[in-house]
Amino acid sequence: MVTSCCSGSMSEAGHILDGLAEHARRASRSLARANAGTRNHALSEAAKALRVRSDEIVAANQKDLAALSEDRNAAFRDRLTLTPERVEAMARGLEDVAGLPDPVGRVLAEWDRPNGLHFRRVATPLGVIGMIYESRPNVGADAAALCIKSGNAVILRGGGESLHSARAIQAAMEDGLRAAGLDEACVQILPSADRALVGAMLQASGKIDLIIPRGGKSLVERVQREARVPVLAHADGLNHTYIHASADPAMARKILLDAKMRRTGICGATETLLIDAAIAPALLPLLVEDLAAKGCTFRADDRARAIVPTLAAASADDFDTEWLDAVLSVAVVDGVEDALDHIARHGSSHTEAIIAEDPEAAAEFLNGTDSAVVMWNASTQFCDGGEFGFGAEIGIATGRMHARGPVGLEQLTCYRYEVIGTGQVRG
């Protein structure tokens, strides 16, 4: 459901948002009552619609790409780009979500009391979710799928650069909802890139139950600063891969190349390499050679530059930078504790990995890292809801309340208590 937006004033934006939220609340009530088969049917039909509309979606995406300013880097363009293959991946993602167990109505716990009352805690939808994301248009499809499956209505706000793409994807989601007999207002998008509409979303206490921002640091900070609605924040993916002295060199080369260069513009990409001083003289030149051959550049500390003098010197801010590009920060460290200290100073609590053959070193790293996801001998690019078996994800939560790591179906539910009696009274 798309409403026209003709002004940037907060009053008009608030009026438009109120209408969207009212429709979403009504839709959320009907969606919560729909059985799992109906919700799954909507997702299957939406997947079909994505395939039918694939040419239309790619053409809309080309409009977004054509309007993109020339100063946007290659990684940003890659995040924005949709191809027939990526549309097909979106469709398969919807089908994967449809095939997951129903998260609604699960009995999370149950117990009896001495007075004969039976208690149970049952998973329920959250209600209306506001999703604010940036350039990747496929995020809208993933978010819509997870919300439909978990019985939540969603209001989507994508980046202004992807508005044509978002509208084309939205049409496919509406096709699926309509085919299943569900309210099309289960999935809505903000009608324009007007920032006043984002402000209205953030102020919609009592109308939107949860805001999930997915994007860069400035977006997340604005949402956290201005929101009067609960926020499930997705922070920077300032991820580290630490190569321990016991690492198998061939494994380390393979993992780091994937962790950095498979897709440089996603939040699961490694942004900093930490390499143990004991292995750095032999291994670091090989790692640099592998990555440079794929177009990667480097920002290195003095110890790394002493081993590979051609590396550019790191500035004071480089180890605090989420590059989202073919750039890697490099530091030499003295063991696990030094690596953990570096991560504590510079990390974003997203994803860290250790490459090691020594299980004691790996255990020390896993237990000592206060991040949402910690890996051993695996690429940080596995930090993805699909790879976790969640079907898709709506973001990576790095806070400590309600959810951490990839946010999938389970994290989009809350619960109610049901109390079953046989006529008990308290008096």
From Swiss-Prot:
Keyword Cytoplasm: yes
Class in the EC hierarchy, top level: oxidoreductase
Cystine pairings recorded for this chain: none
SUPFAM superfamilies reported in the protein's UniProt record: ALDH-like
Superkingdom of the organism of origin: Bacteria
GO molecular-function terms, A-Z: glutamate-5-semialdehyde dehydrogenase activity; NADP binding
A GO CC term assigned to this protein in UniProt: cytoplasm
EC number(s) per entry: 1.2.1.41
Reactions this protein catalyses: L-glutamate 5-semialdehyde + phosphate + NADP(+) = L-glutamyl 5-phosphate + NADPH + H(+)
Pathway involvement of the protein, from the record: Amino-acid biosynthesis; L-proline biosynthesis; L-glutamate 5-semialdehyde from L-glutamate: step 2/2
Gene Ontology BP term (one): L-proline biosynthetic process
NADP listed as a keyword: yes
Cellular compartment(s): Cytoplasm
Keywords: Amino-acid biosynthesis, Cytoplasm, NADP, Oxidoreductase, Proline biosynthesis
Pfam families attached to this UniProt entry: Aldedh
Gene3D superfamilies hit by this protein: Aldehyde Dehydrogenase, Chain A, domain 1, Aldehyde Dehydrogenase, Chain A, domain 2
UniProt cross-references to PANTHER family, sorted A to Z: DELTA-1-PYRROLINE-5-CARBOXYLATE SYNTHASE, GLUTAMATE SEMIALDEHYDE DEHYDROGENASE
Assigned protein family: Belongs to the gamma-glutamyl phosphate reductase family.
Function as written in the Swiss-Prot or TrEMBL entry: Catalyzes the NADPH-dependent reduction of L-glutamate 5-phosphate into L-glutamate 5-semialdehyde and phosphate. The product spontaneously undergoes cyclization to form 1-pyrroline-5-carboxylate.
Protein name per its UniProtKB record: Gamma-glutamyl phosphate reductase
Gene for this chain: proA
